[in-house]
Curated annotation (Swiss-Prot):
Its main location: plastid. It comes from Oenothera argillicola (Appalachian evening primrose). The lineage of its organism: Eukaryota, Viridiplantae, Streptophyta, Embryophyta, Tracheophyta. NCBIfam families: PRK05715.1-2, PRK05715.1-4, PRK05715.1-5. GO terms for biological process: ATP synthesis coupled electron transport; photosynthesis, light reaction. This is NAD(P)H-quinone oxidoreductase subunit 4L, chloroplastic.
Length: 101
């Protein structure tokens, strides 16, 4: 696969994730867009590791660490969203003011 094609795909994924994160009013959708951003970064790490340093697996190992951290972030984020929904009955970002009761 050509390096430029993979980088363009990663840039598209990153752009879609940023756009969704900026325009999203739903907390779950914002978490999904954040995961999309992290996966585009992982795609870059794996691609550069494969093309430029195929003997050492630094990019692949770093990508595995990012996947593990993203899984923990998603679990914690969904737990927070679930707690907010139980208390506020809404998961819209603009309706949840956590300082007011």
């Amino acid at each position: 696969m050509i390096l430029e094609h993979v980088l363009v795909l990663s840039a598209y994924l990153f752009s879609i994730g940023i756009y969704g994160l900026i325009t999203s009013r739903n907390m779950v959708r914002a978490l999904m867009c954040l995961e999309l951003i992290l996966n585009s970064v992982n795609l870059n790490f794996v691609t550069f590791s494969d093309f430029f340093d195929s003997r050492q697996l630094k990019g692949d190992i770093f990508s595995i660490f990012i996947i593990a951290i993203a899984a923990a972030e998603a679990a914690i984020g969904l737990a927070i969203v679930s707690s907010i929904y139980r208390n506020r009955k809404s998961i819209r970002i603009n309706q949840s003011n956590l300082l007011n009761k």
